[in-house]
Structure formats: C-alpha cells, structure tokens
Amino acid sequence: MAARELILAFESSCDETSVAVVENGDTILSNIIATQIKSHQRFGGVVPEVASRHHVEQITLVTDAALKEAGVTYDDLTAVAVTYGPGLVGALLIGVTAAKTIAYAHHLPLIPVNHMAGHIYAARFVKPLAYPLLALAVSGGHTELVYMRSAGEFEIIGDTRDDAAGEAYDKVGRILGIPYPAGKEVDRLAHLGQDTFHFPRAMDKEDNLDFSFSGLKSAVINTVHHAHQLGQELSREDLAASFQAAVVDVLVHKTQKALHQYPVKQLIVAGGVAANQGLKEAMNETLAVNFPDVDVIVPPLRLTGDNGAMIGAAAHIEWAKQHLASESLNADPGLSFTHAS
C-alpha cells in the first residue's frame, strides 16, 4: 500500500455537487462544491428533478477543478470513492455513474461510502479519532445518535421517530418567511430573541434515546396561524428563539443521556445542523460541566454541509478494510446507516 494514498471522492446525494481529493484520509488537497441553493429557493426546498439536472451539468466541471486544485492527475490516484446512499436516487446516480466511469477508465478501485458516515468522519480533519466515540449526526434528513466501538463500526442508539431536526428548521423557517435553507437565519434570529413561548420538548422524559420534532414543528406553525387569525403579529426573534431552545434542549439532553449509558472519549457533532451556533454553544457549555473528560469535536463550518472531502475521509477507513465495490454498484437512497459500505 502506497505511503501517500490519494482518493478522488464524489458527493451528490442532495443539492451539492462536490468532488474532493483527500490524502491519507485527513488532509484535504481540494474540495470543490457547486451549490444549487438559489435554484431550489423559489420552491421552498429541494426539487429532485432540478437537483439531478444540476448534478449532470456540474459533475465534470467540478471533477476537473478538484484535480487541478490538488495538482494531481488520474495516474496519481489510489482509488475513487462515492456516496451511494442515503439520499435522492437521481442525484446519487449522477455521482455513482461518474465515479464508476472514472474508476473503470483508469483501472482504479471503487470505494462505496455511506453519506452519513461521511458526515461523522469529517471530524478526522480536526483531529485523530479516539474510540469508542459517540456521534450526534444532525442534518436535514437525519437525527441520530451513533455509537462507534471502532473505526467503521456503527450502532444507532437513538433515531428520530418523524422529522429530522434540519427538516423542522426549514419548515419552521418557511412559516417565519425565511427562504430555504432556513437554518442559518433561524439561528441568527434566535440569538436576538427570548424563549417566551416554551414550546414542547418532545420525548425528553421518555426512557430512550430517540427524537421527535414533528410535534414541535406543528406547535410553532399553529401558534403563528392562531396569532394571524386574531390579527396579532408575533416576534419572529422570540419564535425562533423558542423553537431553537426546544430543539437544542432535546439534542443536548439526549446526548447527555447517551453519554451516561455509553462512556466514550469523544463526542462528534456532525451534519448540517452542526453549524448551528446555538447548538454548539449549548453542547460545549453543558458537557464542559457534566462531562469534562469528553472531547467535543465539531467539524469546521465548510465541512458540516455536504462535501466531497468528508466522503474521502470515510473512504480512507473503508479502503483500509478493503471494502470495495464492483462495477454493479448502484444508488441506494434508503441505505441503512448501520451499513457504512
């Protein structure tokens, strides 16, 4: 095995076309991201057909840019990696097809990567991981507590029963008049308001590690609709602060509960919602008091959203285990997180 392992990694599971070159699983040589946010904003969310069309238009350009920025050619590569699930089937297919084509044409191994494993392994760009560890993976499509005894070994110990946290942010943002994606603006407004509405903290009293955000989402929407019927104008800042407090309280509470049951050395907060300032502040402050020996790792802002570099980091683990894909690899939109490859 070469001392310098270079992996060309593809990510196209939703609305970002990203290709990266990652060295030895922890060094980013390039990480090109073509976002589609403006194309989806007028629809209030991601439209699968639009996403697929943009991936087709961007995938070759982004690949060329990633190789150029990294200063490498196909001959320098060790392997090609790609997200094959979970995600939007059409979007995934674009990345899978591109990766398979390049791997076949240049006689390179193909490494299949679970999208959510990628989010967790983005922490490898911050510092080496120490097992066992716990990950709180929070995004638009997932809210999961994952226990990892070792590299590549995933056990979901908590999951959402309905909406993911990121999905709730976008839907509440819409009712507050915030364009998609709403997370960053809801977070900003929340820091300007107060928790005056005291929305429900779902499942925080139940004896499990699962989440539920649909009731909270409905509570916010119903509060706003009721006020409009009465001709009242509610504070967007207070609504955002009250909603975010309810989300963050539950995420922190369940994470602490998991840490009591699963002693670990590190906690990774991963996924798009990991960019939320309110969540980071609450998690760091609470764990510093109650779990001072647990090292909290949050990937930098540029690596919390979907990106190719995180797929390269995950692929390095899979490559070490020789978990490779054949040319029959297909997109798996409902891929289970318990199977990283």
Swiss-Prot record:
Catalytic activity: L-threonylcarbamoyladenylate + adenosine(37) in tRNA = N(6)-L-threonylcarbamoyladenosine(37) in tRNA + AMP + H(+)
Keyword Ribonucleoprotein tagged: no
GO biological process, one term: tRNA threonylcarbamoyladenosine modification
UniProt keywords, alphabetically: Acyltransferase, Cytoplasm, Iron, Metal-binding, Transferase, tRNA processing
Cofactor note as given: Binds 1 Fe(2+) ion per subunit.
Matching InterPro entries: ATPase_NBD, Gcp-like_dom, KAE1/TsaD, Peptidase_M22_CS, TsaD
Record GO cellular component, one term: cytoplasm
Localization per Swiss-Prot or TrEMBL: Cytoplasm
GO terms of molecular function: iron ion binding; N(6)-L-threonylcarbamoyladenine synthase activity
EC number: 2.3.1.234
Region forming the signal peptide: none
Residues involved in substrate binding: A137, V138, S139, G140, G141, D170, G183, D187, N276
Cofactor: Fe(2+)
Binding site for Fe cation: H115, H119, D306
Family: Belongs to the KAE1 / TsaD family.
Function: Required for the formation of a threonylcarbamoyl group on adenosine at position 37 (t(6)A37) in tRNAs that read codons beginning with adenine. Is involved in the transfer of the threonylcarbamoyl moiety of threonylcarbamoyl-AMP (TC-AMP) to the N6 group of A37, together with TsaE and TsaB. TsaD likely plays a direct catalytic role in this reaction.
Name of the protein: tRNA N6-adenosine threonylcarbamoyltransferase
Protein encoded by which gene: tsaD
